[in-house]
């Protein structure tokens, strides 16, 4: 029912958009040459950390992206983002975001915004480009990889911004809160696969990974199993355009219940706190750090299947003219803290590791960009005892991307 509602809304807003005269249509094509020694990718049913594994060497489609924006009125805008990865998902081209945004004209130093639809929570300071992409690296940090895999706000978000700098103050402040549904499955991938580092976003009507192979074939994301709204609330501050901070608390408020046949799993109750800082001391340098810590658990049995998870990263980027160089260090950990299977397997599951990412980008022309990225990810994953792989692995991946944006 929820997916039918989203599809009906999609058709309705696109019909409304068709009546508008002015619109923006973006096209992005990303082609890559890949070399990897990584273990079987998490996107193909394995426990590797990276998007591509040792069987994926050669030319690959990074993505084909379409973005659509139209101003329906002076204060109302519609945004749609669609993407194709060429990895045989349920739909060859699928939506990642679709929402309407209302920004009433500010009559004072306070400005409101209301978003309704399906969109990303404003947690990331890294993924700043249209299509929720990063200008710094090809692969997202572990934190934002997970956001792209399992989190989407399907509901409404209200923001209230104090325009302090327009009034001569040193800072702007923003407060936001959202209510959402269709995210009772958040935590499924984190518990079963651990953290990852890639840029493959889950789509609104798709399955995780290649044709749903990484999880059971019928596993669907973004489903509403308990008819109970989740929420998040946060605040952001921007000091003179030099320092930006974001703080969020997220809770999907999933009601625990037995296995649901729609996902062949239980609903997962997931909550976390996130703090991010972005510092731009000069026109050339950008420093970003983000921290996220939370818990997720399922099962109506006792003890519950419970996990604690956290990750943090530090990214430094230098840009001058057509060149940009970026480096990022990630730490990540997820640890099972309770299990109703402990009597059978004798140990708790978990994932612990760190990764280095280096990237260099050159803008070749107005529409063409070349990006070279290398990742080394070290991880120890207890679940690998079931696949016969070494528990501790060092995985490396190189990608050379040629990107067209218009």
Identify the function of each model-found stretch:
Residues 7-17:
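Bacterial N-terminal signal peptides
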Residues 34-62, 220, 260-261:
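Surface-exposed strand-loop-strand hairpins of Gram-negative outer-membrane beta-barrel proteins
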Residues 23-36, 55-192, 236-243, 315-337:
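Outer membrane beta-barrel
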Residues 1-4:
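Positively charged n-region of N-terminal signal peptides that target proteins for export
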Residues 60-63, 79-81, 94-97, 151-155, ...:
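Transmembrane beta-barrel architecture of outer-membrane proteins
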Residues 18-22:
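Sec/Tat signal peptide C-region and signal peptidase I cleavage site
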Residues 53, 99-102, 118, 242-406:
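Outer-membrane beta-barrel pore domains
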């Amino acid at each position: 029912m929820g997916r039918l509602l989203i599809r009906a809304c999609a058709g309705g807003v696109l019909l409304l958009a068709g009546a508008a005269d002015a619109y923006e249509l973006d096209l992005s094509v990303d082609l890559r040459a890949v070399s990897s020694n990584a273990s079987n990718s998490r996107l193909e049913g394995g426990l590797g950390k990276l998007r591509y594994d040792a069987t994926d060497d050669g030319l690959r489609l990074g993505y084909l992206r379409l973005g659509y924006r139209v101003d329906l009125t002076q204060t109302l805008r519609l945004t749609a983002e669609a993407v194709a990865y060429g990895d045989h998902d349920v739909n060859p081209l699928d939506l990642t975001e679709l929402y309407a945004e209302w920004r009433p004209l500010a009559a004072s130093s306070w400005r409101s915004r209301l978003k309704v639809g399906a969109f990303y929570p404003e947690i990331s300071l890294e993924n700043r480009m249209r299509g929720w992409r990063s200008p710094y690296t090809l692969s997202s940090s572990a934190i934002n990889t997970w956001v792209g895999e399992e989190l989407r706000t399907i509901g409404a978000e209200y923001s209230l911004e104090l325009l302090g700098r327009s009034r001569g103050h040193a800072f702007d402040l923003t407060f936001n809160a959202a209510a959402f549904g269709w995210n009772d499955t958040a935590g499924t991938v984190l518990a079963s696969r651990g953290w990852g580092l890639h840029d493959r976003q889950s789509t609104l009507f798709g399955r995780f990974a290649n044709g749903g192979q990484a999880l059971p074939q019928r596993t669907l994301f973004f489903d509403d199993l308990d008819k109970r709204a989740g929420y998040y609330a946060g605040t952001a501050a921007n000091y003179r355009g030099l320092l930006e901070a974001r703080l969020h608390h997220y809770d999907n408020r999933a009601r625990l219940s037995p296995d649901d046949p729609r996902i062949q799993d239980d609903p997962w109750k997931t909550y976390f706190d996130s703090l991010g800082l972005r510092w731009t001391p000069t026109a050339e340098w950008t420093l970003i750090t983000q921290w996220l810590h939370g818990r997720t658990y399922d099962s109506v049995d006792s003890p519950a299947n419970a996990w604690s998870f956290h990750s943090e990263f530090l990214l430094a980027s230098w840009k001058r003219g057509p060149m940009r160089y970026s480096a990022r260090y990630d730490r990540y950990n997820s640890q099972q803290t309770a299990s109703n299977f402990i009597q059978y397997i004798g140990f708790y599951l978990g994932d612990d590791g760190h990764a280095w990412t280096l990237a260099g980008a050159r803008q070749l022309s107005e529409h063409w960009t070349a990006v070279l990225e290398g990742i080394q990810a070290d991880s120890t994953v207890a679940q690998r005892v079931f696949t016969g792989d070494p528990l501790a692995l060092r995985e490396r991946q190189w990608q050379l991307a040629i990107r067209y944006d218009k």
